């Protein structure tokens, strides 16, 4: 396919140092170099999700709570453009945000891009204080436990408009009290933004 003006490109890449330490960076940019009004609005929401989650992260705080903070910011931002409604806290508790943010906030990083996950995500990212959720979206959070000094991790939120998922949730009337499906139809061709 040929990239066209008005489309977005999402680049998720990294490099490895001679000492074998990994990096990971994700950015989304417009093909023509200029975001349109809708793209700019979604980009600003994702940027705020990242900024607030990043600032929340410090030793002793759980990464799961950073994820939930980003999810709450997503709901508030999507409410501001008419795609969601209701109290953000309630929408996040029911998982309504996961229609747009269906993955975890990030992961640990070190000698591997997803550091030590070969041992098992539950062993690395969870402990006796934090169990993995079975809620859609939150179940894909790779790291939930309390952060410790020296942890290296990514903070890479995203918002996506996945037609198949939208159709499925709309048909099931899932989270109708939080999602404005009528307005959401105009975003079916949007794609997504992650940073």
Predicted regions and their residues:
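Active-site neighborhoods and metal-handling regions in enzymes and metal-associated proteins
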Residues: 1-195
